[in-house]
Every structure is written in structure tokens, then in C-alpha cells.
UniProtKB/Swiss-Prot annotation:
Binding residue positions for substrate: 229
Annotated positions binding heme: 463
EC number of the protein: 1.14.14.1
Species the sequence originates in: Chelon auratus
Subcellular location(s) of the protein: Endoplasmic reticulum membrane; Microsome membrane
Family: Belongs to the cytochrome P450 family.
Gene from which this protein is expressed: cyp1a1
InterPro entries documented for this protein: Cyt_P450, Cyt_P450_CS, Cyt_P450_E_grp-I, Cyt_P450_E_grp-I_CYP1, Cyt_P450_sf
SUPFAM superfamilies: Cytochrome P450 (SSF48264)
Stated name of the protein: Cytochrome P450 1A1
GO molecular function terms noted in the UniProt entry: heme binding; iron ion binding; steroid 17-alpha-monooxygenase activity
Gene Ontology annotations for the cellular component aspect, listed alphabetically: endoplasmic reticulum membrane
Lipid bilayer topology: Peripheral membrane protein
Cofactor: heme
Reaction(s) catalysed (UniProt annotation): an organic molecule + reduced [NADPH--hemoprotein reductase] + O2 = an alcohol + oxidized [NADPH--hemoprotein reductase] + H2O + H(+)
């Protein structure tokens, strides 16, 4: 979101631009005159010289994950750029990022007060909130406990170990039938179109306890809202980095607020229904689990503060929005990689055939017996790096990193793409090779190497839905690979070039799939 300013620069009228220009120049001169003094023993942050008003926007360009990676080669793992009027510290390198987010976690646990963040979940988002004090931490802990409790809820029938497994398994089987139907009718399918609806249905089941028909208007409306959110964020909001623009007409920002209002209205309605029908002895979904953990509980021993209905709405909204975009993007990329590397697809199928068989559906407990599949997922996360940056961080106090002084309230970008493609960490990082995560005999995943892959952030702001997301990607993939063979249209090149956005997606395309019969191979 923070690196989307460039496409929007030309969208202002002449009068708006003149007002902004004069005001920003004055503010720029004032800020420059009050630059912080560097404490003795520390160095000033290196980085490219910014232009007035726009800063380093032109150098960052439309593919910031690449341009900032190149800058890190020149300036090191800690350097500063300027986006509009706001100084931004960019962190690269595995050790540097771990030092900041884990060892100095409290100092880098903030969120910058970006204008657009105030409108996500009406400012009550757990993920985007600038708050990181005791109450926020207690709420995060409570939300994490609720998710953990939900993930262990028993399924409705003995064949499923938990309700999470049941939701994913049933939806994956439905997706397979649908793709088979589409193939017979049209001869090809758009992978993202069908995957995103299936993932949305799983998340609706987990969050709201309800499953929709794939043509249901409410479900498709939610999917479209998520898509609109990504598009609007992708167009950028300069008001995040040039504050005076907050007071000027902004069609993109107006649309952004409208999308968030529509999302929150839907979730509020569902949460209200859950409160009205809540039964402590019958926890139906994540919303019930959150309500259960909030009922008559204090957030911590010293604060008589309970999580309000609005906070529950904010958490559910975060989980739905982030989960839908992240998981659907991961699975869509996975199918693309299966098509791009048919020999790996065949190895994955043989692994499933040998360790699970073809007479039953893969389950969560099979995961440890499928090391190649686990390595494949890790390599997709690493190679695609579809989440090139975390949500921006912010320093909570004056601090230092690698000998450089970083003032309080400095916006911080974490370049996950750089870490996932760092030649110091990975041999031939541009090559797609799941075997890099496997032991010599191919029977175990190297957990140390696996933990180096950056996808869900680190430290105190790490994604609380990570475990559920990883399980969902694993189960969907295991079932799809067991039942379907994916391949490309004859003569059609497969374009794996990512399109930069909130999450990086591949270009929309059409693929083919055939249902495997049990006698295959």
C-alpha cells in the first residue's frame, strides 16, 4: 500500500497541484531545518538524495521490490528513501530484519499513522492499528487464542480431525467437480477466478459458519469487494505521504473508504447475528470462538477492559480480507508452477500416491509424510514472493540498527522479496527448485532453511492467521494434485511475470485440467 503512490501522481488537477506544491515546499523547508541531530557513535542513514515534494518516487518506480533490492546492494541492508514528504527506512537481509523485528521487536513493533490505515475496519483493525501498547497486545493474544481454539474444534463426522480440515476438504472436492464441468463445457479455465471463490467459501465457513453456492450473490459480492480493494490500493494514495492532500478532493480515497464501509457493514451484520445466537456449548466458527474468549474476560490482570463488539468485527474483517487475498494468491501461483514444471507435478502426484494412496482424501496428519509437497509450498512462497513487503512498520522510540540512527515514528519497509532472493542465503535464487529444502535422501524438510523464507512477517506483528493459512494451502494443494492433472493450452506461452500490487499476482490466463483416474500410472 505504501509503495503505490507513483501511478496516482498525475491524477491531480492543475489547481490542486499548485496548492499542494506551494504548501509542500514550505513544509519541506521547515522539516529540513529541524533535521534530527545524530547521537555520538552512530551514523546517518545512507540512501539516494530525494527530490523536493516527491522524494525518491521516480527511482522506486513501478516495481519497488526490484528497485529497493538494487538500492540495498549500493547502500546496504539499512538505508533511507523518501516517499513524498515521509522518510522511509528500508530493511533488507535476513539477519538485519531478524535483529529489528525479533531482537529489537518492541522498537520496531509500531505501525505508521498513514491516512488510509484509519479507514480500514473503521480504524479498529488489529493488523493496521498504530496502537501497540498493552491493551493492543492483550487483544492480539486473545485473538490468537481464539484462532487456536477454533483450529482444534472437532469435525462433524469422524473422518475429519477438525472443523478446519472439514471445510477445506469439502470445498476442494467441490472445486474439482466444478473444474471438471468447466473443462467439458469450455475446454479451459481461469485458475484465479475459480480458486478465489473456493477460498472465499472456506473462509466464510471458518469465520461465519456458513457455506455459499458458488453463484450466490452475497459470496460473489464479497469476492468482488476484495478485488476492488486490491485495485484501489494498487492505484496508490499520495495523501499517506503528502499530508496536505488529505484535504483535497480524492476520488480514489473516496472509493477506498466506500469499499471498507461495505466490507465492515457485512461483517457487522454477521457478528451481530452471532451475538444473538451465541451458545457457549456450541462454538460454530471463528466468530463464536472470539466471542467466547471475550465473554466476561479481562484483557490482562491490570486492565478491566473487554474486547468490544467493534473490535471483534475488526478482527474478523482482518482475517477475512487478508486470508482471502493471501491464500487465493498462493494457490493460484501454485497451479501456475505445477503447469510450468510438469516433472515436479508428476513427482508430487507419485508422493501422494505412495504415502496417502488414491482411495482417500489427504488430511492434515499426512503432512509430515509429504516432504516434497512441503518443500514445493516453501519454494512457491520464496520464488514468487507474492507478498514482497510486510505491512509497513514504525519505530516506537529513537533507536539504532547496524550502527545507524533511526528516530522515533520512522516508517519502516521490510523487503521480504530481497530476503527470499538473496544469493547469500540461496544458491541460484532465481531458479525454482523445491529440492533446495529437502535432505539428501529427500525424506525430510530442512526446517532451518524453511524458516528463512519470509512470507508472513516476523516478531510482534507476525500474521496471527499464519498456521491456518499454511494448513489451507497444504490441504487444497494435496487434494488438487491427487485428483487433477494441470497443463497449459497448446502453443500458449505461460507468463509468470508478477503484477505488482498489495499481493503480486500472475497475469490472468486460461489453463487445462483433467481428472486423474485411479489407474493412472
Amino acid at each position: 500500500m505504501a509503495l503505490m503512490i507513483l501511478p496516482f501522481i498525475g491524477a491531480l488537477s492543475v489547481s490542486e497541484s499548485l496548492v499542494a506544491l506551494v504548501t509542500v515546499c514550505l513544509v519541506y523547508l521547515i522539516i529540513k531545518s529541524f533535521q534530527a541531530n545524530i547521537p555520538e557513535g552512530l551514523s546517518r542513514l545512507p540512501g539516494p538524495k530525494p527530490l523536493p515534494i516527491i522524494g525518491n518516487v521516480l527511482e522506486v518506480g513501478s516495481r519497488p521490490y526490484l528497485s529497493l533490492t538494487e538500492m540495498s546492494k549500493r547502500y546496504g541492508n539499512v538505508f533511507q528513501i523518501q516517499i513524498g514528504m515521509r522518510p522511509v527506512v528500508v530493511l533488507s537481509g535476513n539477519e538485519t530484519v531478524r535483529q529489528a523485528l525479533i531482537k529489537q521487536g518492541d522498537e520496531f513493533a509500531g505501525r505508521p499513522d498513514l491516512y488510509s490505515f484509519r479507514f480500514i475496519s473503521e480504524g479498529k483493525s488489529l493488523a493496521f492499528s498504530t496502537d501497540q501498547a498493552g491493551v493492543w497486545r492483550a487483544r492480539r493474544k486473545l485473538a490468537y487464542s481464539a484462532l487456536r481454539s477454533f483450529s482444534t474444534l472437532e469435525g462433524t463426522t469422524p473422518e475429519y480431525s477438525c472443523v478446519l480440515e472439514e471445510h477445506i476438504s469439502k470445498e476442494a472436492e467441490y472445486l474439482i467437480k466444478q473444474l471438471d464441468t468447466v473443462m467439458k463445457a469450455d475446454g479451459s479455465f481461469d485458475p484465479f477466478r475459480y480458486i478465489v471463490v473456493s477460498v472465499a467459501n472456506v473462509i466464510c465457513g471458518m469465520c461465519f459458519g456458513r457455506r455459499y453456492d458458488h453463484h450466490d450473490r452475497e459470496l460473489l459480492s464479497l469476492v468482488n469487494l476484495s478485488d476492488e480493494f486490491g485495485q484501489v490500493v494498487g492505484s496508490g494514495n499520495p495523501a499517506d505521504f503528502i499530508p496536505i492532500l488529505q484535504y483535497l478532493p480524492n476520488k480514489t480515497m473516496k472509493k477506498f473508504v466506500n469499499i471498507n464501509d461495505r466490507f465492515i457493514s457485512f461483517v457487522q451484520k454477521i457478528v451481530s447475528e452471532h451475538y444473538a445466537t451465541f451458545n457457549k456449548d456450541n462454538i460454530r466458527d471463528i466468530t463464536d470462538s472470539l466471542i467466547d474468549h471475550c465473554e466476561d474476560r479481562k484483557l490482562d490482570e491490570n486492565a478491566n477492559v473487554q474486547m468490544s463488539d467493534e473490535k471483534v468485527v475488526g478482527i474478523v474483517n482482518d482475517l477475512f480480507g487478508a486470508g482471502l487475498d493471501t491464500i487465493s494468491t498462493a494457490l493460484s501461483w501454485s497451479v501456475m508452477y505445477l503447469v510450468a514444471y510438469p516433472e515436479i507435478q508428476e513427482r508430487l502426484y507419485q508422493e501422494l500416491k505412495e504415502n496417502v494412496g488414491l482411495d482417500r482424501t489427504p488430511v492434515l496428519s499426512d503432512r509430515n509424510n509429504l516432504p516434497l509437497l512441503e518443500a514445493f509450498i516453501l519454494e512457491i512462497f520464496r520464488h514468487s514472493s507474492f507478498l514482497p513487503f510486510t505491512i509497513p512498520h514504525c519505530t516506537t522510540k529513537d533507536t539504532s540498527l547496524n550502527g545507524y540512527y533511526i528516530p522515533k515514528d520512522t516508517c519502516v519497509f521490510i523487503n521480504q522479496w530481497q530476503i527470499n532472493h538473496d544469493p547469500e542465503l540461496w544458491k541460484e535464487p532465481s531458479s525454482f527448485n523445491p529440492d533446495r529444502f529437502l535432505s539428501a535422501d529427500g525424506t525430510e524438510v530442512n526446517k532451518v532453511d524453511g524458516e528463512k523464507v519470509m512470507v508472513f512477517g516476523l516478531g510482534k506483528r507476525r500474521c496471527i492467521g499464519e498456521v491456518i493459512a499454511r494448513n489451507e494451502v497444504y490441504m487444497f494443494l494435496a487434494i488438487l494434485i491427487q485428483k487433477l492433472h494441470f497443463y497449459n493450452l497448446p502453443g500458449e506461452p505461460l507468463d509468470m511475470t508478477p503484477e505488482y500490487g498489495l499481493t503480486m499476482k500472475h497475469k490472468r490466463c486460461h489453463l487445462r485440467a483433467t481428472v486423474r483416474v485411479r489407474s493412472d500410472h
